[in-house]
Regions:
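Leucine-biased recognition of intrinsically disordered, low-complexity hydrophobic segments
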Residues: 9-10
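Catalytic cores of enzyme domains
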Residues: 25-214
Length: 214
């Protein structure tokens, strides 16, 4: 856990409900600001987490994923502070069983993609609002489908102004980031049953003094 004379500032956003014919879910957000160097000291372990990336099909196949052509620590230390943002998604029928694993995976992909689209857009808007800032998305790139990423053809990214790495791609421990800094335990589906909630962990690197980010 973080050991510091100054505790990170935890902010909690009121619940947001989304009710549509296709789905119903509730979103709850928490955010915390911490010094970048302290966050690196406590949660950065690229030697360990790069191994998980290498086991993923997105490794070296997506421009937002490793390996990178820059030093991640130098990239991070351009900014003095980092906001960690935890977005909890509570499905309205969290105990609902699915007939097959494939149906469950499709549901999860559709739900998380929908929330990611809103969250990524918000983070890019915040970059424009606060100069000298950089977002980290909650997962791999969603601007292109994996098979259409230009990296597969050794070509430059077609969305260089939008693409952002995730914390895990930069080598951070997301499980302990969520539990220690946000008080959120990461949950997963099991036996084709939805968990109580899903969690997206994104971040906002900045040199600005921001009282409330989201």
């Amino acid at each position: 856990k973080v050991q510091s004379n100054k505790e990170p500032l935890l902010k909690e956003k009121p619940v947001f409900n989304c009710n549509t014919k296709a789905d119903m879910y509730t979103i709850k957000e928490k955010s915390v600001c911490i010094n970048t160097d302290l966050y690196i000291k406590c949660y950065h372990n690229p030697q360990k987490f790069i191994q998980f990336c290498k086991e993923c099909k997105m490794y070296n196949s997506c421009w937002s994923c490793p390996p990178f052509d820059f030093d991640t620590k130098t990239y991070l230390l351009k900014h003095t502070s980092i906001w960690i943002i935890g977005t909890q998604i509570f499905p309205s029928q969290f105990e609902r069983p699915f007939a097959t694993k494939e149906e469950l995976i499709l549901y999860e992909q559709n739900l998380l993609t929908k929330v990611r689209k809103q969250l990524d857009s918000l983070l890019l808007t915040l970059e424009n609002k606060y100069p000298e800032s950089r977002a980290c998305f909650a997962g791999t790139c969603h601007f292109c489908s994996p098979s259409k990423c230009k990296r597969n053809k050794h070509l430059p990214c077609i969305y260089p102004q939008k693409i952002r790495p995730s914390l895990e791609a930069l080598g951070f421990d997301i499980e302990h980031t969520a539990s220690d800094l946000l008080g959120i335990e990461l949950l997963w589906s099991k036996n084709n049953i939805l968990p109580k909630y899903y969690t997206l962990v994104s971040a906002f690197l900045t040199n600005n003094k921001i009282k409330k980010l989201v």
